[in-house]
């Protein structure tokens, strides 16, 4: 009686996976192996600008165990593949955020955390410096609404990002083009002149003292200021005479 190991299979039959082979060999594809390695070792770049980052700091403690997802916080964008934006993004900070994103290695992912990051939050109605959504600057993969969102919501976002990475295909990477960029013509940001030019003390209003101060310390008052003061005094006198 022959054992199963020494049994000779008929070569004309359909190929079958024996029990010994299925118990000792893992069958997969390069694409699945690549996605498994990516989603199991995400290295986030922590980008916190406001109070939402306090909730994210709770993830680093032992209660929520940030490391069980394989996440290793990085301080340099060149070694990170995930950026978590938490807090308000201002017009002045927008170019720095875009530069950090550009320095990250491909493939890279973005998680927008909090209402201020997603839509501007409470600053979206009357603020002239808040960016109304970080997706106007960089492409966002997962949104976390809340003001601020709880650590459990952050964990759920990480799980959703891992599922998204697991469903990716290496052959479609060329189609995933980034459409939202700070320097393109598609954005709705309006260029404004710089406020701090370094020439504030060199301006004419700062070089010459006020006429009241110049007259008090004995400095000569410019004729233009004297004429303006005379006309103003004459108008005040006419107003008083008309009232009488």
From Swiss-Prot:
It comes from Synechococcus sp. (strain JA-2-3B'a(2-13)) (Cyanobacteria bacterium Yellowstone B-Prime). Its main location: membrane. Gene3D superfamilies: 3.40.50.12280. This is NAD(P)H-quinone oxidoreductase subunit K. Its EC number is 7.1.1.-. GO terms for cellular component: plasma membrane-derived thylakoid membrane; respiratory chain complex I. HAMAP family: NDH1_NuoB. Signal peptide: none annotated.
